[in-house]
Amino acid sequence: MEKIKIIVASDSIGETAELVARAGISQFNPKQCKNELLRYPYIESFEDVDEVIQVAKDTNAIIVYTLIKPEMKQYMSEKVAEFQLKSVDIMGPLMDLLSASVEEKPYNEPGIVHRLDDAYFKKIDAIEFAVKYDDGKDPKGLPKADIVLLGISRTSKTPLSQYLAHKSYKVMNVPIVPEVTPPDGLYDIDPKKCIALKISEEKLNRIRKERLKQLGLGDTARYATDQEELNYFEEIVSEIGCPVIDVSQKAIEETANDIIHYIEQNKSK
């Protein structure tokens, strides 16, 4: 079967049109809906539209477009009708409905949704912070962090840090293991921004046994230090005086929501 060609055309980067096209394609058997996406971003002139139209004529392609400027959208609509081409205007009908509902004209500015604002930069800054201060790499991050996660291994400190970073929180995580003395700065920061991640000995042992099996060491191998690590963890957490969340039976998203709830509650105190 010949591939279905889909032209994704936009006066911005074309991300919206491509997502819609791929969402539509995903609803069909890939063996029966073989496809090829042809991208035409940053359409700025009638000549650019003419190029898209010509390719669609030559390849019998479907045009999926998001054109915001009225003159470009109108020109595309006219050309599609003139040559009886298959097309979908993603933004046009919705913008017309919104305009009628609010009784206002749209901005008609391509790419406005991608405009970089303070919130975007804050999130990027938080993500970079989480990478830089992952696994207690540099204690200088402790006073700068919004949240400091403490825990032994296998408590999902790193994925939690990244998840929270995408919510724009600067997160540092510090491993608590008997062989390594916690950084001095840990005792100097506000314990309200520290969260200790606890895991049951049974769950920890099960995770580690599975890990050993993956390494080819056999399912009878076991860690002898589980209880020692947990005891040391309890000792450090008690000294710091921070709250503890048991992550033994929790998904990362659930733990993250608990952390956010606690942090936001204490901000107002």
UniProtKB/Swiss-Prot annotation:
EC numbers, comma separated: 2.7.11.32, 2.7.4.27
InterPro entries: Kinase-pyrophosphorylase (IPR005177), PPDK_reg (IPR026565)
Catalytic activity: N(tele)-phospho-L-histidyl/L-threonyl-[pyruvate, phosphate dikinase] + ADP = N(tele)-phospho-L-histidyl/O-phospho-L-threonyl-[pyruvate, phosphate dikinase] + AMP + H(+); N(tele)-phospho-L-histidyl/O-phospho-L-threonyl-[pyruvate, phosphate dikinase] + phosphate + H(+) = N(tele)-phospho-L-histidyl/L-threonyl-[pyruvate, phosphate dikinase] + diphosphate
UniProt GO molecular function: ADP binding; ATP binding; phosphotransferase activity, phosphate group as acceptor; protein serine/threonine kinase activity
The entry's keywords: Kinase, Nucleotide-binding, Serine/threonine-protein kinase, Transferase
Binding residues for ADP: 151-158
Pfam families assigned: Kinase-PPPase
Family assignment from sequence similarity: Belongs to the pyruvate, phosphate/water dikinase regulatory protein family. PDRP subfamily.
Protein's job: Bifunctional serine/threonine kinase and phosphorylase involved in the regulation of the pyruvate, phosphate dikinase (PPDK) by catalyzing its phosphorylation/dephosphorylation.
UniProt-listed NCBIfam families: PRK05339.1
Protein name, per record: Putative pyruvate, phosphate dikinase regulatory protein
